[in-house]
Amino acid sequence: MKTSIAIVDYGMGNLRSVAQALMKAEPAADVKIVDRPEAIRAADRVVLPGQGAMPDCMRCLGESGLQEAVVEASRTKPLLGVCVGEQMLFDWSAEGDTKGLGLLPGKVVRFALEGRLQDDGSRFKVPQMGWNRVRQTQAHPLWDGVPDDAYFYFVHSYYVVPDNPAHTAGETLYGDVFTSAVARDNLFATQFHPEKSAEVGLRLYRNFVHWNP
């Protein structure tokens, strides 16, 4: 029987590219972009994408009527947060003093890199845009077949700071070391975009399809 994956459509996120990447990673999966609570409840696993500003994402999720179904899914189903979808899992964001879903304890803060120079003498830019390495800080099924220190694609100005260091699954250096992937029980989330990260991103998505926490 096919595993069914609901990509949550609350009006914020690159849904089609996520769906296409999941279907390419595992053609046998039943991937759907969904905008109804019952479709989230019916799915075997859930992807929460997010792009733009966290205040807008949280507002749109609340207005969509899907927030309760996402929180319900987070208790029992494999759930993958991507980019702002990762940030939304936490308690609070400094971006617009925004309350998150509170599924993982911690906060979201902005890069404090103004005026700092990189090794080549150029200034750090915020947002970080481009490829960067992810060092795996814990063994996890979603890292299966993904080389440690592999390059993933990032576009962001904010990043998560988990209260519990054990929830950090990956770290990245951009001026300072920050948490770029988190994991706890049936939750996994990334600051980077797997769908924009070539073969290693597809591998992570394939691992998510087959993950049974």
Swiss-Prot record:
Complexes and interactors: Heterodimer of HisH and HisF.
Major localization class: cytoplasm
Compartments it resides in: Cytoplasm
Protein known as: Imidazole glycerol phosphate synthase subunit HisH
Function, as annotated: IGPS catalyzes the conversion of PRFAR and glutamine to IGP, AICAR and glutamate. The HisH subunit catalyzes the hydrolysis of glutamine to glutamate and ammonia as part of the synthesis of IGP and AICAR. The resulting ammonia molecule is channeled to the active site of HisF.
Gene behind the chain: hisH
Listed EC numbers: 4.3.2.10, 3.5.1.2
Listed PROSITE patterns: GATASE_TYPE_1
InterPro entries named among the record's database cross-references: Class_I_gatase-like, GATASE, Imidazole-glycPsynth_HisH
Source organism, top-level taxon: Bacteria
HAMAP family hit by this protein: HisH (MF_00278)
Signal peptide: none
Domain Glutamine amidotransferase type-1, chain residue ranges per copy: 4-213
UniProt pathway annotation: Amino-acid biosynthesis; L-histidine biosynthesis; L-histidine from 5-phospho-alpha-D-ribose 1-diphosphate: step 5/9
Active-site residues (renumbered): 83 (nucleophile), 193, 195
Example GO biological process: L-histidine biosynthetic process
Gene Ontology cellular component annotations, sorted alphabetically: cytoplasm
Transmembrane segments: none
UniProt keywords, alphabetically: Amino-acid biosynthesis, Cytoplasm, Glutamine amidotransferase, Histidine biosynthesis, Hydrolase, Lyase
Any one GO molecular-function label of the UniProt entry: imidazoleglycerol-phosphate synthase activity
The reaction(s) this protein catalyses: 5-[(5-phospho-1-deoxy-D-ribulos-1-ylimino)methylamino]-1-(5-phospho-beta-D-ribosyl)imidazole-4-carboxamide + L-glutamine = D-erythro-1-(imidazol-4-yl)glycerol 3-phosphate + 5-amino-1-(5-phospho-beta-D-ribosyl)imidazole-4-carboxamide + L-glutamate + H(+); L-glutamine + H2O = L-glutamate + NH4(+)
Taxonomic source organism: Burkholderia mallei (strain ATCC 23344)
